[in-house]
């Protein structure tokens, strides 16, 4: 009976692996390109800009398509060319001058050949989720520290807060230290879990998308925070409130650390985050009142 159960588990694992094998085989056909030292930085830039582009188009259309304003956090705001170009320029410059040498060192230490077998689907999904949770924890601690220590904020993090209203290309408008910190945590987590290269690829795509969505300024019915239940995920309004208030919502994605440490504030666009937490609702209302007072003062 025990042998029969073991056999069933092995068959299940093989079937999970077979689901991803065709995809992995197609990637391996371009192994020379995937193993290139230029691949990580090119992949990162094109993935990032590819995710930003739809939101840039929406920002251009927004003044002439009134229905789009219904989904904007700040309906009357659209980034100007003078705001977009510096963000694009800084992203390209930092990736080429700073991120590329770091990825080159990582490439030199990576295996010479890609594995023949794809990961199991369950393993890929679990590793991506764990990497996201680890990244969320690390950035929460990093972010909180850089807001609590004035010198760290002024020296390293203030650049990212120059744009108080979020837009997609402002996602990576940050200091070199901040960008390298994010890159370090990215690499550290997949190394600790010894992730399969396909898992690493998927994690980077998901991580880039979530960060762009958080800064996009658009809250759609299909936004991630509306798909994740129980208010576990913050979302675009959650992060936009951080850019407005500075002293709340330090975690990039999930809400558990802000809830535990009392720094969660609930944006008017996402009251669902406050479900089941009266204290969170109170603090969210206080935060909203503070925001209105701040606008009146200015």
From Swiss-Prot:
<keyword id="KW-0443">Lipid metabolism</keyword>
<keyword id="KW-0479">Metal-binding</keyword>
<dbReference type="GO" id="GO:0008203">
    <property type="term" value="P:cholesterol metabolic process"/>
</dbReference>
<dbReference type="InterPro" id="IPR006694">
    <property type="entry name" value="Fatty_acid_hydroxylase"/>
</dbReference>
<keyword id="KW-0408">Iron</keyword>
<protein>
    <recommendedName>
        <fullName>Cholesterol 25-hydroxylase</fullName>
        <ecNumber>1.14.99.38</ecNumber>
    </recommendedName>
</protein>
<dbReference type="GO" id="GO:1903914">
    <property type="term" value="P:negative regulation of fusion of virus membrane with host plasma membrane"/>
</dbReference>
<dbReference type="GO" id="GO:0034340">
    <property type="term" value="P:response to type I interferon"/>
</dbReference>
<dbReference type="InterPro" id="IPR050307">
    <property type="entry name" value="Sterol_Desaturase_Related"/>
</dbReference>
<dbReference type="GO" id="GO:0005506">
    <property type="term" value="F:iron ion binding"/>
</dbReference>
<dbReference type="GO" id="GO:0090206">
    <property type="term" value="P:negative regulation of cholesterol metabolic process"/>
</dbReference>
<dbReference type="GO" id="GO:0008395">
    <property type="term" value="F:steroid hydroxylase activity"/>
</dbReference>
<keyword id="KW-0256">Endoplasmic reticulum</keyword>
<keyword id="KW-0444">Lipid biosynthesis</keyword>
<dbReference type="Pfam" id="PF04116">
    <property type="entry name" value="FA_hydroxylase"/>
</dbReference>
<feature type="transmembrane region" description="Helical">
    <location>
        <begin position="38"/>
        <end position="58"/>
    </location>
</feature>
<keyword id="KW-0472">Membrane</keyword>
<keyword id="KW-1207">Sterol metabolism</keyword>
<dbReference type="GO" id="GO:0035754">
    <property type="term" value="P:B cell chemotaxis"/>
</dbReference>
<keyword id="KW-0560">Oxidoreductase</keyword>
<dbReference type="GO" id="GO:0005789">
    <property type="term" value="C:endoplasmic reticulum membrane"/>
</dbReference>
<comment type="function">
    <text>Catalyzes the formation of 25-hydroxycholesterol from cholesterol, leading to repress cholesterol biosynthetic enzymes. Plays a key role in cell positioning and movement in lymphoid tissues: 25-hydroxycholesterol is an intermediate in biosynthesis of 7-alpha,25-dihydroxycholesterol (7-alpha,25-OHC), an oxysterol that acts as a ligand for the G protein-coupled receptor GPR183/EBI2, a chemotactic receptor for a number of lymphoid cells.</text>
</comment>
<feature type="transmembrane region" description="Helical">
    <location>
        <begin position="190"/>
        <end position="210"/>
    </location>
</feature>
<keyword id="KW-0756">Sterol biosynthesis</keyword>
<dbReference type="GO" id="GO:0016126">
    <property type="term" value="P:sterol biosynthetic process"/>
</dbReference>
<dbReference type="GO" id="GO:0001567">
    <property type="term" value="F:cholesterol 25-hydroxylase activity"/>
</dbReference>
<feature type="transmembrane region" description="Helical">
    <location>
        <begin position="84"/>
        <end position="104"/>
    </location>
</feature>
<feature type="transmembrane region" description="Helical">
    <location>
        <begin position="124"/>
        <end position="144"/>
    </location>
</feature>
<feature type="glycosylation site" description="N-linked (GlcNAc...) asparagine">
    <location>
        <position position="163"/>
    </location>
</feature>
<feature type="transmembrane region" description="Helical">
    <location>
        <begin position="167"/>
        <end position="187"/>
    </location>
</feature>
<feature type="short sequence motif" description="Histidine box-2">
    <location>
        <begin position="157"/>
        <end position="161"/>
    </location>
</feature>
<keyword id="KW-0752">Steroid biosynthesis</keyword>
<feature type="short sequence motif" description="Histidine box-3">
    <location>
        <begin position="238"/>
        <end position="244"/>
    </location>
</feature>
<keyword id="KW-0812">Transmembrane</keyword>
<feature type="glycosylation site" description="N-linked (GlcNAc...) asparagine">
    <location>
        <position position="5"/>
    </location>
</feature>
<comment type="similarity">
    <text>Belongs to the sterol desaturase family.</text>
</comment>
<dbReference type="GO" id="GO:0000254">
    <property type="term" value="F:C-4 methylsterol oxidase activity"/>
</dbReference>
<keyword id="KW-0503">Monooxygenase</keyword>
<keyword id="KW-1133">Transmembrane helix</keyword>
<keyword id="KW-0753">Steroid metabolism</keyword>
<feature type="domain" description="Fatty acid hydroxylase">
    <location>
        <begin position="128"/>
        <end position="263"/>
    </location>
</feature>
<feature type="short sequence motif" description="Histidine box-1">
    <location>
        <begin position="142"/>
        <end position="146"/>
    </location>
</feature>
